């Protein structure tokens, strides 16, 4: 086999591969003879079909099957011999004739080689959240609201009421798509609608009609509406008042608390502290990773981005309960491209730093992280044993330990400032980020 490496711009190169004719033809001949022993053909007994007739009728098909198997073997050997780190490959068949060498080109996209420097340029705003009894009591109040029952009342709408409304949204006097609904249930103050919408309903009475003006957020998912002003014609059809349950043993049992009311507040606080810790870690990590992407300079392999896009499509279809008959190719790549590129770049950067700094996860560190994570479960020890039997879960935990070490290492060199934040705002932002798929 003859291999010529042709370097191209950036992370691209080509392998011009030539396989001797006698090697290819020998394999094809063997396959033809093997086929002749098993194929059925009119006028011949099984196993007695002449190889020449098999070649005449099926020779091209057999040759293409041989070539399809041979090409990956040959370019894999060439890649190994040349010690190339390949991210993606496309093959062009150049010559494929009996009695002549097989010639093809393997166009390669390589993993980029780069070094990350300039960590001192990264800016991170570290959120600081004070968790007091006030926040704990507010959380318990929120839990009561989750289990609230509602009864109809004859008065004006107040905060925390559940209303049934019809509404029609308009831009410049024209009804816009997706901006209207009938018999929509809405809890006032839930934040379900865009800012200003729910406040605009407060004070309305049953059967009253009102037109309100609101502005869509700049980051609204529909870019045609983002930052734009709109009006909504609203009709209130029903007003219901919330009745909150008492905080008693029956109430706390619904949230898996076994110690009754006496331990409820302590458990709620522990859960809040645990959730807050992981959310704040995630917020800091996201800033660190964003900063790393900004300082790192390299070309991102398109093959890796495409692979990530395909995986995101499959995950979305699975989450939405899509069946096997759904063609994921119907989903346009551009919906997933930005996130896919971000994920690939982050992964390449982290791998580069981990290799250069030789970060590792010690067994004791993995065990400590596992102990912390399982506290969120009803049966921590049982959950811990189940996870320890799952190699994939343990591998993920090791990755998380290393990721945490890397983050701390970058933070030690970055420009870090602190910012006071509200617990419930942090939780809300985290939920919005998860819903947006980030």
Swiss-Prot record:
Its EC number is 5.2.1.8. It is found in: Cytoplasm. GO terms for cellular component: cytoplasm. Residues 160-245 form the PPIase FKBP-type domain. Keywords: Cell cycle, Cell division, Chaperone, Cytoplasm, Isomerase, Rotamase. Coiled coil: none annotated. GO terms for biological process: 'de novo' cotranslational protein folding; cell division; chaperone-mediated protein folding; protein transport; protein unfolding. GO terms for molecular function: peptidyl-prolyl cis-trans isomerase activity; protein folding chaperone; ribosome binding. InterPro entries: PPIase_dom_sf, PPIase_FKBP_dom, Trig_fac, Trigger_fac_C, Trigger_fac_C_sf, Trigger_fac_ribosome-bd_bac, Trigger_fac_ribosome-bd_sf, Trigger_fact/SurA_dom_sf. Pfam families: FKBP_C, Trigger_C, Trigger_N. It catalyses: [protein]-peptidylproline (omega=180) = [protein]-peptidylproline (omega=0). The keyword ATP-binding does not apply. Involved in protein export. Acts as a chaperone by maintaining the newly synthesized protein in an open conformation. Functions as a peptidyl-prolyl cis-trans isomerase. Consists of 3 domains; the N-terminus binds the ribosome, the middle domain has PPIase activity, while the C-terminus has intrinsic chaperone activity on its own. Belongs to the FKBP-type PPIase family. Tig subfamily. PANTHER family: TRIGGER FACTOR CHAPERONE AND PEPTIDYL-PROLYL CIS/TRANS ISOMERASE (PTHR30560), TRIGGER FACTOR-LIKE PROTEIN TIG, CHLOROPLASTIC (PTHR30560:SF3). This is Trigger factor. It comes from Francisella philomiragia subsp. philomiragia (strain ATCC 25017 / CCUG 19701 / FSC 153 / O#319-036).
């Amino acid at each position: 086999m003859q291999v010529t490496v042709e370097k191209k711009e950036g992370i691209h190169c080509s392998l011009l591969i030539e396989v001797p004719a006698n090697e290819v033809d020998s394999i094809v001949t063997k396959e033809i003879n093997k086929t002749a022993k098993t194929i059925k053909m009119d006028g011949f007994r099984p196993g007695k079909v002449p190889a020449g007739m098999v070649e005449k009728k099926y020779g091209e098909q057999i040759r293409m099957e041989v070539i399809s198997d041979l090409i990956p073997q040959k370019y894999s050997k060439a890649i190994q011999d040349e010690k190339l780190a390949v991210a993606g490959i496309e093959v062009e068949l150049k010559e494929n004739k009996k009695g002549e060498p097989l010639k093809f080109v393997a166009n390669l996209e390589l993993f980029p080689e780069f070094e990350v420097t300039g960590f001192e340029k990264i800016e991170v705003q570290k959120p600081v959240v004070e968790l007091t009894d006030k926040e704990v009591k507010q959380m318990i109040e929120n839990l009561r609201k989750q289990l609230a029952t509602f009864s109809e009342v004859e008065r004006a709408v107040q905060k925390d009421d559940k209303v049934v409304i019809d509404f029609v949204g308009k831009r410049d006097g024209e009804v816009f798509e997706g901006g209207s609904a009938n018999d929509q249930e809405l809890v006032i103050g839930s934040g379900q609608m865009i800012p200003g919408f729910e406040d605009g309903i407060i004070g309305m009475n049953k059967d009253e009609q009102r037109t309100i003006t609101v502005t869509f957020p700049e980051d609204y998912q529909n870019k045609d509406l983002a930052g734009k002003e709109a009006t909504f014609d609203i009709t209130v059809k029903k007003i219901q008042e919330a009745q909150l349950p008492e905080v008693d043993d029956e109430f706390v049992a619904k949230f898996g608390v076994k110690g009754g009311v006496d331990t409820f507040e302590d458990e709620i606080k522990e859960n809040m502290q645990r959730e807050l810790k992981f959310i704040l870690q995630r917020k800091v990590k996201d800033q660190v990773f964003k900063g790393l992407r900004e300082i790192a300079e390299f070309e991102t392999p398109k093959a890796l981005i495409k692979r990530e896009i395909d995986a995101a499509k499959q995950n979305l279809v699975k989450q939405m309960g899509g069946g096997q008959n759904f063609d994921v190719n119907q989903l346009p790549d551009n919906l997933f491209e930005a996130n896919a590129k971000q994920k690939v770049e982050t992964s390449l950067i982290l791998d580069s730093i981990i290799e250069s700094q030789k970060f590792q996860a010690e067994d004791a560190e993995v065990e400590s992280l596992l102990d912390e994570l399982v506290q969120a479960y009803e049966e921590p020890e049982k959950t811990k044993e189940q996870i320890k039997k799952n190699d994939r879960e343990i591998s993920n935990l090791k990755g998380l330990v290393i990721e945490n070490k890397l983050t701390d290492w970058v933070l030690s060199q970055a420009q870090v400032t602190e910012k006071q934040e509200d617990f419930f705002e942090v939780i809300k932002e985290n939920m919005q980020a998860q819903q947006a798929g980030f």
